[in-house]
A protein has these predicted regions:
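Terminal amphipathic alpha-helical/low-complexity segments used for targeting or macromolecular assembly
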Residues: 1-58
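Hydrophobic beta-strand core residues of beta-sandwich domains
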Residues: 8, 53-55, 59, 67, ...
Length: 116
């Protein structure tokens, strides 16, 4: 049987209150708080590399960054994001090399049931 995490990233119905998902979300909130308070770009990049599923070597993200889990986000080489990036990574988000993201961009993967 698939875990709630496996169901979630497959786009199936899942229980967000699952202990594994709650632990991932809590860890993500802690890293989010640390990143959004960090003023040193190198330390900020180190937090992102620890937080996200994978990243290239060269990346720069301005604050505020808001995500659900972080582990489902994959960034290529030479990634830049301007202010107020939101990435709701219920399902994987993959951005390739040499990407520049403007201010106030949102990558939203959740989809709530449309049929009762």
């Amino acid at each position: 049987m698939a875990s709630e995490y496996e169901k979630m990233i497959a786009g199936d119905y899942y229980r967000p209150a699952d202990p594994e998902l709650r632990a991932l979300a809590k860890a993500s909130r802690e890293k989010q708080e640390a990143f959004n308070q960090e003023v040193d770009p190198k330390k900020g990049a180190a937090i992102i590399k620890e937080w996200f599923g994978s990243t290239g070597e060269n990346l720069y993200l301005n604050r505020q960054v808001l995500v659900d889990y972080g582990v489902n986000i994959h960034l290529g080489e030479n990634f830049y994001a301007n202010y107020n990036l939101t990435m709701l990574d219920i399902c994987p988000i993959t951005i390739g090399n040499n990407a520049m993201i403007g201010p106030n961009c949102q990558f939203l993967t959740p989809l709530h049931p449309l049929d009762p």
